[in-house]
Amino acid sequence: MILGHAARSLREHGTIRSVTLQDSAFLRACRRQPVPHTPVWFMRQAGRSLPEYRKLREGVPMLEACARPDMIVEITLQPVRRYNVDAAIFFSDIMVPLKAIGVDLDIKPGVGPVVAEPIRDLAATRRLRGLEPDDVPYVTEAIRELVRELGSRPLIGFAGGPFTLASYLIEGGPSRHHEHTKALMYGAPEVWTELMRRLSAITLEFLRVQIAAGASAVQLFDSWVGALSAEDYRANVLPYSSWIFAQLAEFDVPRIHFGVGTGELLGLLSEAGADVVGVDWRVPLDQAARRVRPHTALQGNLDPAVLFAPWSVVAERTDDVLARAKAAEGHVFNLGHGVLPTTDPAVLERLVEYVHTQTAN
C-alpha cells in the first residue's frame, strides 16, 4: 500500500529512527525498556484548561481548528512548552476523519459531536466511503511541521476506536446508555458488522496518515467501550480492534489502547494487540498489571479530579500510582482520563516536575 511505503521511507530517513527520539523516556517506557525517569503526558493536555488555548480558539469552531495546520501545530505545542511533558499528542478530534469523508456532523460546545442523520441501517452504512490521505492534507502538513519542531520529543497520533465512533454515528451524539447502539449490535448483526468494518478501515487509514507524516506512537481511544460486558466486547468489538492493531504492526511504532470504565476489559484490551494499555483511575495499576497479558506496558492512572485537592493529596496519590506501577513491565504516567477543563495548569506543571524528580535514576 502506498501509505505503508511512505511510512517506511520516513523511518528509513530518520524521522522515526532518530537515535535521540528512540531514546526518549516515553518511547522506551512504551517498549518496556529502562528509563531515566517515568515519562509523563496527559490526555487533553492541549485544551480548555490552558488560557493560551482558550485565547487562540476564540471564535474558531473546533472542527475548523482541527483543519488548520497553523492552529494544530500551535495548540499541540502549548502544553509541551508549559509543562515539559515527555510527549506531545496531535491536536485533533476523533470525529475528524468522519467529517473528512462527508458525514454531516458538528462538535457543539458543551454537548460534543452531533450527527445530523444517525446511521441505523445497511443503506446508510454503505454510504460511508473510505478515507484517503488527500481527505486530510492538513494532518500531514501539521504533523510534518510538529516533528521538525519537537525534535527528540515524540509525537503521539491518535484515532477513535470503532465502537466509540459507531456509538456517535448511531446515537447521533453523546449517549449515557448507548441504547440505540446496543440495539443495533444485538438486533441487526449484519449492519453492525458492515459498520464496524468500515469504521475500522477509516480509523486505520487515519492512523497510517499520521505515522507516514512522522508520528512516533499512536493511541486508539475507544472511550465508550466500557459500556460493554466482556462477552459483548469479545464478540462485537475485539475482532475489529485486533485487526487495526495487527495492520499497524508493520510500522514498528508503539500502539496504545485506552477506554474509560474498562477495568473488566483490560485483559481483552491487551489481547487486541496493543503494546501499552491505558488504565482509568478505577483500577490500581498493580491489579491492572495482573489483568493484561505479558509484555504489556501500562499508562495512567491518577484520577483527574484529584488535581483539585490540596497539593499534599496530589503528591500522596501520585506516589501511590508510582508505587503500584512498579508491578508493570513499563509505565507511562498519565491521568485516568482527560484533563478537566477547569484544572489549574500550575498543578499540572508541578505534577510533571514531581514525577520526574521522584522517579529520576
Swiss-Prot record:
Single Gene Ontology BP annotation: protoporphyrinogen IX biosynthetic process
Pathways per UniProt: Porphyrin-containing compound metabolism; protoporphyrin-IX biosynthesis; coproporphyrinogen-III from 5-aminolevulinate: step 4/4
EC class name: lyase
Catalytic activity: uroporphyrinogen III + 4 H(+) = coproporphyrinogen III + 4 CO2
Keyword Protein transport: no
Binding site for substrate: 44-48, 93, 168, 223, 337
Subcellular location: Cytoplasm
Keywords assigned by UniProt, alphabetized: Cytoplasm, Decarboxylase, Lyase, Porphyrin biosynthesis
Annotated site residue numbers, Transition state stabilizer: 93
Record keyword DNA-binding present: no
Gene3D superfamilies (alphabetical): 3.20.20.210
GO molecular function, one term: uroporphyrinogen decarboxylase activity
E.C. designation(s): 4.1.1.37
Complex and partners: Homodimer.
Entry similarity comment: Belongs to the uroporphyrinogen decarboxylase family.
PANTHER family: METHYLTETRAHYDROFOLATE:HOMOCYSTEINE METHYLTRANSFERASE RELATED, UROPORPHYRINOGEN DECARBOXYLASE
Function: Catalyzes the decarboxylation of four acetate groups of uroporphyrinogen-III to yield coproporphyrinogen-III.
Family annotation (HAMAP family): URO_D (MF_00218)
Protein name per UniProt: Uroporphyrinogen decarboxylase
Species of origin: Thermobifida fusca (strain YX)
Gene name tied to this protein: hemE
